[in-house]
């Protein structure tokens, strides 16, 4: 039953009837046969443009190397296709040959299995299937039947045996494994290249913790660049304000003597005397000081100190009085330190510029009133000193100093040295008091306290001014004191000393 089924399958495939046929053994089973040999050729793909009217050639070289050349059709544009490969001997594989004319079936042994591949020099892929007389008997395996003296002649009828597939299948697997290994090596190199690119990209994606390294580098390089570029650090307003405050304080602390000497020598060189100007012109001079070194220092000093602290400056700038006058003024300052300290905490950069005109006039009138009271006491002391000096025959030096002080624009520098020393000493003490009374505080927190302290000071200064006006009675209607009265008193003292001589 099994044979019948097999015959039916073969009959269907070969269009053979159901009759029983004889199986003949071919010449290959004869041990003395040296003329007949059957080979199989296996190629990697099936070409389409094969010219079946021409013969193909098989060349077996040394070391089992085989070259197969297949002619192509003229329409393909390529004359032929070349295949190269190796051959292996068969051991148990056979081939059945069916003759349609006679109906005889012959079995033959297979000699070699040839596996070839298309060479890369050719562009198109071609077929290895060769034409023969028994081409219709092909079993679909594409075998080449060669006959000849050496067993490698021209193909006459490709016929496949049932055991051929089982014999060639492992060969095929081995060849494909070799081919696949080669292709895997090539594709493996490509994959390695892709893997090489992936690590380059993957650190970029996964290096978020490692990217902070350049982020940390940039701030380290940025400060050096900012340090070189002073334009980026200078425009910040808080830095400018802080630098100016510290710079002005250092200038006041280090150059107190220079500021005093410069202000004292200003009138000798023709500058305006700050001690003898009115209240309105005194504020105008602060904003419109001449662009000299001494004028700038005086303006910076006046802007640094608050308005209540500036009331000490007219008495300091008012030159032309002896050491007794400066001593009396120093006592006057010691008697009222509490009135000067509260506003001394304000910054002079914006305090004096932000005050109203009415408040400025009130402050200047108060400062001038205090200075006038101090000068009145000093004049009284000077008159008593001049009278006592005339009686003790030592009025020459006092009268000379008074006469020199009365002429402020024409006095020599030699007669002013003792006065300058006393004023320098007093100015240094005032600068130290300012430095001790000016901490680095904000303007916003000081301005309300300054307003309250200013109102308290105004209330305290009103009865004091009334007492001074009642005692002195020599003030002008505009809040200032006339310079003519002071000069007349000084001239009277000098004349009395001359008469005594």
Curated annotation (Swiss-Prot):
InterPro entries: EAF_fam, Tscrpt_elong_fac_Eaf_N. Residues 200-221, 256-270, 302-314, 329-343, 416-437, 455-471, 483-501 have a biased composition (Low complexity). Residues 138-149, 173-192, 271-283 have a biased composition (Polar residues). Residues 138-226, 256-501 are annotated as: Disordered. Keywords: Activator, Developmental protein, Nucleus, Phosphoprotein, Transcription, Transcription regulation. It comes from the Eukaryota. The keyword Transcription regulation applies. One of its GO terms (molecular function) is transcription elongation factor activity. Belongs to the EAF family. Promotes transcriptional elongation by Su(Tpl)/ELL. Essential for development. This is Ell-associated factor Eaf. It comes from Drosophila yakuba. The gene is Eaf.
